[in-house]
Amino acid sequence: MGLSIFLLLCVLGLSQAATPKIFNGTECGRNSQPWQVGLFEGTSLRCGGVLIDHRWVLTAAHCSGSRYWVRLGEHSLSQLDWTEQIRHSGFSVTHPGYLGASTSHEHDLRLLRLRLPVRVTSSVQPLPLPNDCATAGTECHVSGWGITNHPRNPFPDLLQCLNLSIVSHATCHGVYPGRITSNMVCAGGVPGQDACQGDSGGPLVCGGVLQGLVSWGSVGPCGQDGIPGVYTYICKYVDWIRMIMRNN
């Protein structure tokens, strides 16, 4: 009953915080991203996330709220899809190497353990972790409810998707000299297409596996020509992720 009441409150009133969203994407196919998570504080969307196990969600470390309402199986944020599941995050584990966005964006990932496991359905499913690292030129996509390029309605109601490709480490280092490490991967750089404010922690999916989490990018407008977004390179953290889940 408590979750049902909370869901009704969510669909009756929704606000979105100015934290990284999909810029110039298109509506995702319904149920095409069953691992997509929205992290809410009350009715305010704070970050994206990705379901990687029936009880674990992965998001960005800079999404620093202590407790979240975790919404899964969502497509529209303002209308009932009848596929939603709501969970409350229990405890979380931030990567011990993360020093904060003001110091370095490295190790920008955080695991959230759900108080109750999800029910796996066609609309709610975990996304596999990678066995290998995606290389330059790999075609991927990113999803979220972040800022769009529509001036009258910058915060989308419907889940947005965007296709983009992995950029070489050398190219990305040239754009962000001295700031890119081997634990980061860059994608995009096509004019007008990017993750943007509000998509933080959301998944970069390549070949049906999780390769990145939306982390950071240019301080200027989203979707600048030749300016890729920067993602936490999940292939570098698989052992740590599995250790945390196994021990908790």
UniProtKB/Swiss-Prot annotation:
Signal peptide interval: 1-17
Protein location: Secreted
Single GO BP term: protein maturation
Boundaries of every Peptidase S1 domain copy: 22-246
Native organism: Homo sapiens (Human)
Keywords: Disulfide bond, Glycoprotein, Hydrolase, Protease, Secreted, Serine protease, Signal
Presence of keyword Magnesium: no
Protein name: Kallikrein-12
Covalent S-S links between cysteines: C28-C161, C47-C63, C133-C235, C140-C206, C172-C186, C196-C222
Recorded GO CC terms: extracellular region; extracellular space; secretory granule
A Pfam family of this chain: Trypsin
Membership in a protein family: Belongs to the peptidase S1 family. Kallikrein subfamily.
GO molecular function: peptidase activity; serine-type endopeptidase activity; serine-type peptidase activity
The gene coding this protein: KLK12
Catalytic center residues: H62, D108, S200
Glycosylated residues in this chain: N24, N163
Coarse class of the protein's main subcellular location: secreted
Enzyme class: hydrolase
EC number from the UniProt entry: 3.4.21.-
